[in-house]
UniProtKB/Swiss-Prot annotation:
It comes from Bacillus cereus (strain ATCC 10987 / NRS 248). Zn(2+) 2 binds at C818, C892, C899, C902. Its EC number is 2.7.7.6. This is DNA-directed RNA polymerase subunit beta'. The gene is rpoC. Binds 1 Mg(2+) ion per subunit. It catalyses: RNA(n) + a ribonucleoside 5'-triphosphate = RNA(n+1) + diphosphate.
Length: 1203
């Protein structure tokens, strides 16, 4: 038996009239829907039961046959087959049209496919189809040309003159005749000949025509099928009619549109039977044509047909398009059963992998499992009584529920799901109340807080789904962020504050210099008030359980504080004892200066030493990363839970509060402001004398005030007491920063107006002093702009993510090694002298392409194809090596994806990437998710051209859409020397002298030069400040230069905003933008000049002709923006579900495209498992068996794969 869901590819094409009739179960002859008295469908109408099947299961129209035993019987009285009512979702009907009509997609699309096939203009076609002109279909022996248009008057004149020696007609019938007469092979040969000589517009037109004609020739579609003789009627359940409360009916718009077609069709039939005058018949045919147009795509031509209240009716095309269309609403996003949502509250007592599920919700979600268990335990006799027990909530139900949810993970999701950490799995524990409890450490990943956020719960049902949830999605498994490989579960707010307070040191605290034999004794002393948490004490090192101490150190005393003793208890034994927040202490061992000989004067030694800084949020993050690197995930998650508990406990003990008295106003503030004001007055004086321009005055005033603010900030931070609660909050990284503090206690400073230009009047007051009315008014400008920006940014960033996902969704790790011999030469990314991304960051987790040797000693640091770990990267960076050749996604040879070696390490797990990992989607999420943190601003620094470069989110969109950038730089097309810079008519010209030729570049007005005479310049380098247009760069240089430029630019934007993203994510996206080439000369291949081809398709076509010793084709690489690249993908399902649905489908149907179902979207649409992860063929054969608790040993969580 064939499996309906198991097919290799999906093909789309034009349907012939016979094909449409073969789909149909009967002809719809009447426009009636249902009888309003009996509420039964009318016979032969749009809801007819004889055509589409019965309305009720196993029951015919007249009621003669009822019950399932008559299955398959066709009633002799009403002709309805007795079957399930579900067939009304799949059975189609048809309408036999009295006159052929054209299909609006093929006639009206851009370019008009019908027009290209017939070589007629769309305007001429329109005149013929809508009965305004005649077209000559057979010229006979008259001087008329075939396809010539004739007006009514001309037609009459020629008829009188030549009689019936020629034929001309109107409407779709005429076009159909012309389409049937076309000899595709002859036309194609003729066009190929023409291409050899044609130039300009004629050449472009010929290429377009050739593409469409070749498509028809190769796909087996007949051009005449673009004209409809038969109209399919979609199943009635897809255009339902429902009764409302008041007895009125609500119906789908399609029924109205079908009704108009049937009415006009029947009237036309009657007129033809009566032999009505041709003018009336023509008018009726035109109306039929318009009715069919409205049904297929309402509003595409002329005014749309409207329903009640002047609302345009939704046609078949509208059912597919847009967010509410079939693709995005029903095929790509379905609502699921076994789900619930509720408000979240914090669950500080949960373990990392747990969540609290409200009892009533759990009972409803796990209902089938509970019912099964009730029957198995004999607590209920059958399923029905089990169901009744649950609905009445009888006490025994709760015990069963407890046992059912053990070992059964649930998925929690918070919208918006910006990256894969927006859905994670947890083990549920039952809680009272109606709120979901969430572990505080996973909030960062979800971006959740407890001010009323809601979350959704989903239950994985099959054992495979449960296994995947447990092994891959459990919150304790997702400790690292896929975008940069740094821990995402770092403590925040209270937890940070507690650990910060715990590790503080204070000079002269109670009991300073006491010596204890072990940690317990120190704790005892603390609990009895002899020492404080912050007291610096000594403990016998041998009693501190730590594997990194040497034998010598164990015989000494360790100087530390009571708080640090408590803090170090949470770390694994073999981890260094952390006494100071430095990397050397974290990675290697405790510094020797903290060990003293027994018998030394401890008090003196302690008194002579500085206080050691406490552990801030950043240090805690580093500790987590280090523990993760050395130990298993389980160990890390245990440590995180202990860190969380410590944090909450000691932030409670600390009792840190904020009061107005904690905000101390700086005494020297007035002095600083006076000085600044004097400088500003001086600048204004110079301006009035005409010594400086308006621009300069503005810039100087701005810089004076920002300097004043910086001075105040510096002095404030110095004058602050280290015990000040606000300082502790910002220093620990719990909340707030230095700038917030300056605004509270110093001055608010300069504000921007709504256009983003800085207002030169600063706000001199601080919040502690209070703002004047004018100052308050100025500050509202910036605040309002901030709120408006945030709202816009969220939508923009979401749309960016959607486009990124779409372009990269089929990039999957497909093989272990593609065997490429190319690599990418990388160094640190710099902007001026500032390093934006260091070489170390770019090397970690990549494979070396070529051996790296020490520049001085020549020893091999990294071998070819070796993974560069953190340690190796440090060694390479410190050796003074500037550039390293690595394997990169840019140079990967794998088709439809990348290989393991070129991708490198999976950032989310810190291990090698697995075959089947959907790295394209991960890349898209990693770039899109921080999008909301980028600013919307185009910074206006007083409008100096070249300075107004776009930054933030708009710049990222500019890069990925490959648009011409704002403030575009002029680039040199040749290597050479800057020979001269001349002034020509208030502009400048730069002359670049190369070895062979000299080029002169006109510099746009107001652009700032980047070069000086005599300077060496290479091709593709900027002559002026600004952003390079990557398309220009591609013309001048090669693909590699463009790839590196785009990568560098994206990293610049994100790093400037303090967001770190792994290079490999950007590489995957940029690679997708450069996948296509445009054929410039076809050689002796089958490809058409001017067409876009995938690089692999192009090389295949060339390989084929080269083997036969023929002339290969040539092509140029093309840079496509992500939207364009998504629409150019090979998969028509993916493209149609993205944007421009009708255009994509029209094109695909004519070409008879096959979708090979390689990407993820295509498979989601047709309901197959996605071909990534465990859905890949190589993993499909695995059988999962649910085991008991004893077998489930956490260490052995490998799943064995049988090939």
């Amino acid at each position: 038996m064939i499996d309906v869901n198991n097919f290799e590819y999906m093909k789309i094409g034009l349907a012939s009239p016979d094909k449409i009739r073969s789909w149909s179960y009967g002809e719809v002859k009447k426009p009636e829907t249902i009888n309003y008295r009996t509420l039964k469908p009318e016979k032969d109408g749009l809801f007819c039961e004889r055509i589409f099947g019965p309305q009720k299961d196993w029951e015919c129209h007249c009621g003669k046959y009822k019950r399932v035993r008559y299955k398959g019987v066709v009633c002799d009285r009403c002709g309805v087959e007795v079957t399930r009512a579900k067939v009304r979702r799949e059975r189609m009907g048809h309408i036999e049209l009295a006159a052929p009509v054209s299909h609006i997609w093929y006639f009206k699309g851009i370019p008009s496919r019908m027009g290209l096939v017939l070589d007629m203009s769309p305007r001429a076609l329109e005149e013929v189809i809508y009965f305004a002109s005649y077209v000559v279909t057979e010229s006979g022996d008259t001087p008329l040309d075939k396809k010539q248009l004739l007006s009514e008057k001309e037609y009459r004149a020629y008829r009188d003159r030549y009689g019936s020696t020629f034929q001309a007609a109107m409407g779709a019938e005429a076009i159909k005749k012309l389409l049937q007469d076309i000899d595709l092979d002859k036309e194609v040969d003729f066009l190929k000949e023409e291409l050899k000589t044609a130039q300009g517009q004629r050449r472009t037109r010929a290429i377009k025509r050739l593409e469409v004609l070749e498509a028809f020739r190769n796909s087996g579609n007949e051009p005449s099928w673009m004209i409809l003789d038969v109209l399919p009627v979609i199943p009635p359940e897809l255009r339902p009619m429902v009764q409302l409360d008041g007895g009125r009916f609500a119906t789908s718009d399609l029924n109205d549109l079908y009704r108009r077609v049937i009415n006009r069709n029947n009237r036309l039939k009657r007129l033809l039977d009566l032999g009505a005058p041709s003018i009336i018949v023509q008018n009726e045919k035109r109306m039929l044509q318009e009715a069919v147009d409205a049904l297929i795509d309402n509003g595409r031509r002329g005014r749309p047909v409207t329903g009640p209240g002047n609302r345009p009716l939704k046609s078949l095309s509208h059912m597919l398009k847009g967010k509410q269309g079939r693709f995005r609403q029903n095929l790509l996003g379905k609502r699921v059963d076994y789900s619930g949502r509720s408000v979240i509250v914090v669950g500080p007592n949960l373990k990392m992998y747990q969540c609290g599920l409200p009892k009533e919700m759990a009972l409803e979600l796990f209902k089938p499992f509970v019912m099964k268990e009730l029957v198995e335990k004999g607590l209920a006799h059958n399923i029905k009584s089990a169901k009744r027990k649950i609905e009445r909530v009888q006490p025994e139900v709760w015990d069963v529920l407890e046992s059912v949810i053990k070992e059964h993970p649930v998925l929690l999701n918070r919208a918006p799901t910006l990256h894969r950490l927006g859905i994670q799995a947890f083990e549920p524990t039952l809680v009272e109340g109606r709120a979901i409890r969430l572990h505080p450490l996973v909030c960062t990943a979800y971006n959740a807080d407890f001010d009323g956020d809601q979350m959704a719960v989903h239950v994985p049902l099959s054992s495979e789904a449960q296994a995947e949830a447990r092994l891959l999605m459990l919150a304790a498994q997702n400790i690292l962020n896929p975008k940069d490989g740094k821990p995402v579960v770092t403590p925040s707010q209270d937890m940070v504050l507690g650990n910060y307070y715990l590790t503080l040191e204070r000079e002269g605290a109670i009991g300073e210099g006491m010596v204890f034999k072990d940690a317990n004794e120190a704790l005892l002393a603390y609990q009895n008030g002899y020492v404080h948490l912050h007291t610096r004490v000594a403990v016998a090192a041998s009693a501190v359980n730590n594997a990194t101490f040497t034998e010598e150190q164990k015989s000494m005393l360790l100087l530390t504080t009571v708080g640090k003793l408590i803090f170090n208890e949470i770390l694994p034994e073999s981890f260094p004892y952390i006494n100071e927040p430095t990397n050397s202490n974290l990675e290697k061992e405790t510094p020797a200066k903290y060990f003293v000989e027994k018998g030394a004067n401890i008090k003196e030694i302690i008194a002579s030493r500085e206080e050691v800084a406490p552990f801030s949020k950043k240090i805690l993050g580093n500790i987590i990363a280090e523990v993760f690197k050395r130990f298993k995930i389980t160990e890390t998650s245990r440590m995180l839970d202990r860190m969380k508990n410590l944090g909450f406990k000691y932030s409670t003990k600390a009792g840190i509060t904020v009061g107005v008295s904690d905000i101390l106003v700086l005494g020297e503030k007035d002095e600083i402001l006076h000085e600044a004001q004097a400088k500003v007055d001086n600048v204004i004086k110079q301006f009035r004398r005409g010594l400086i321009t308006e621009e300069e005055r503005y810039d100087r005033v701005i810089s004076i005030w920002s300097n004043a603010k910086d001075v105040i900030q510096g002095k404030l931070m110095k004058s602050l007491n280290k015990r000040n609660p606000i300082f502790m909050m910002s220093d620990s990284g719990a909340r707030g920063n230095a700038s917030n503090f300056t605004q509270l206690a110093g001055m608010r400073g300069l504000m921007a107006n709504p256009s983003g230009r800085i207002i030169e009047l600063p706000i001199k007051s601080s919040f502690r002093e209070g703002l004047t009315v004018l100052e308050y008014f100025i500050s509202t400008h910036g605040a309002r702009k901030g709120l408006a920006d945030t709202a816009l940014k969220t939508a923009d960033s979401g749309y960016l993510t959607r486009r990124l996902v779409d372009v990269a969704q089929d990039v999957i790790v497909r093989e272990d090694d593609c065997g490429t011999d190319r690599g990418l030469l990388i160094g640190a990314i710099k902007e001026g002298n500032e390093v934006i991304e260091s070489l170390y960051d770019r090397l970690v987790g990549r494979f070396a392409r070529k051996t790296v040797k020490h520049p001085e000693t020549g020893e091999v640091l990294v071998a070819e194809n070796q993974l560069i770990t953190e340690d190796i990267a440090h060694i390479v960076e410190n050796s003074g090596v500037e550039t390293v050749n690595i394997r990169s996604a840019f140079t990967c040879n794998t088709r439809h994806g990348v290989c393991k070696k070129c991708y490198g390490r999976n950032l989310a797990t810190g291990t090698d990437v697995e075959v089947g990992e959907a790295v394209g989607i991960i890349a898209a999420q990693s770039i899109g998710e921080p999008g909301t943190q980028l600013t919307m601003r185009t910074f206006h620094t007083g409008g100096v051209a070249g300075d107004d470069i776009t930054q933030g989110l708009p710049r990222i969109q500019e890069i990925f859409e490959a648009r011409n950038p704002k403030g575009q730089a002029v680039i040199s097309e040749i290597d050479g020397v800057i020979a001269a810079i001349n002034d020509v008519k208030d502009r400048q010209e730069v002359v670049v002298q190369g070895e062979v030729e000299t080029r002169t570049y006109a510099i746009p007005y107001g652009a700032r030069l980047k070069v000086i005479p005599g300077q060496q310049i290479s091709h593709g380098k900027e002559l002026t400040e600004g952003s390079i247009d990557p398309k220009e760069l591609l013309k001048v240089t090669d693909i590699t230069a463009v790839q590196e430029y785009l990568l560098r630019e994206v990293q610049k934007v994100y790093r400037m905003q303090g967001v770190e993203i792994g290079d490999k994510h950007v590489e995957v996206m940029v690679r997708q933008m450069l996948r296509k080439v445009r054929v410039s000369d076809a050689g002796e291949t089958d490809v058409l000049p001017g067409t876009l081809l995938d690089i692999h398709q192009f090389t295949d076509a060339n390989a084929k002709v080269l083997l036969q010793g023929k002339q290969p084709a040539t092509a140029r690489p093309v840079l496509l923006g992500i939207t364009k690249a998504s629409l150019e993908t090979d998969s028509f399902l993916s493209a149609a579900s993205f944007q421009e649905t009708t255009r994509v489908l029209t094109d695909a149907a004519i070409k008879g495209k096959r979708d090979e179902l390689l990407g993820l979207k295509e498979n989601v649409i047709i309901g197959k498992l996605v071909p990534a992860g465990t859905g890949m063929n190589r993993y499909r054969k695995v059988d999962l068996v649910k085991t008991t608790q004893d077998d489930m040993n956490v260490e052995n969580d490998e799943v064995y794969v049988e090939q």
